[in-house]
C-alpha cells in the first residue's frame, strides 16, 4: 500500500508541536473558569491530533474501496462503548459534572499505555518519533481533569468506577493485513474517545460559564 502524503504527516507533527497554555504538570491554584478553559483546550488539541492521525493512517494503508465496510465493522470495536458513558452532547447534558469528569478521566487513562507504542506504527519519524509527547499531553490532560475533580469536591477525592480493561498495544507488523486493521481500529477508537472527552468538558464549561462558544 502506498505511503501517505508527506504534507499530511507534517501537519500531524505541527499539531504535536503546538504550545499548551501551561507546561506539562502545571496546574497551580487558579479560578475554576481557567481550569475548565485549559482542560478544554488540551482536549481539543488531542482530539484534532487523533483525527488527523487516523486520516493519515487511512490514506497510507487502507484502500479506499475497503474503508466504508471496515468503518461499519468498527462500530462495536471500542470497549469504551461498554461503559455507561454519554454518547453525545445531548446525553452529556443529562449527567452531573462529576459524572462527566469521571468518564473523561477513564477515557484518557485507558490510552496512557497504548500511545507509548505509536512511534513503532509509522515508519515516518516525523509523525510518531515524538509519541512520548502525545503521552505527556494525555498525562497533562489527566492532571487537569483531576484538578477539576478536586476543586468541585473541595479537595476531597472521591472514588469513581475503575476501567480495568485497557486497549491493546499497536501492532508494529505493518506487512500484515490483520495488524493494519487492528491499528486502524485502535486509531478509530482513540479518535472517538478523545471526541467524547472533549465533548464532556465543553458541556461542563458551557453549563457553568455561559459563552458564545457553547454552540458546538
From Swiss-Prot:
Localization per record: Secreted
UniProt keyword Phosphoprotein, yes or no: yes
Entry's Gene Ontology BP terms: animal organ development; growth hormone receptor signaling pathway; positive regulation of growth; positive regulation of receptor signaling pathway via JAK-STAT; response to nutrient levels
Cystine pairings recorded for this chain: 78-189, 206-214
Signal peptide range in chain numbering: 1-26
Record field: transmembrane: none
List of residues binding Zn(2+): 45, 198
Residue list for modification Phosphoserine: 131
Record has Phosphoprotein as a keyword: yes
GO cellular component: extracellular space
Keywords: Disulfide bond, Hormone, Metal-binding, Phosphoprotein, Secreted, Signal, Zinc
GO molecular function: growth factor activity; growth hormone receptor binding; hormone activity; metal ion binding
Domain of life: Eukaryota
Family: Belongs to the somatotropin/prolactin family.
Role, per record: Plays an important role in growth control. Its major role in stimulating body growth is to stimulate the liver and other tissues to secrete IGF1. It stimulates both the differentiation and proliferation of myoblasts. It also stimulates amino acid uptake and protein synthesis in muscle and other tissues.
Record protein name field: Somatotropin
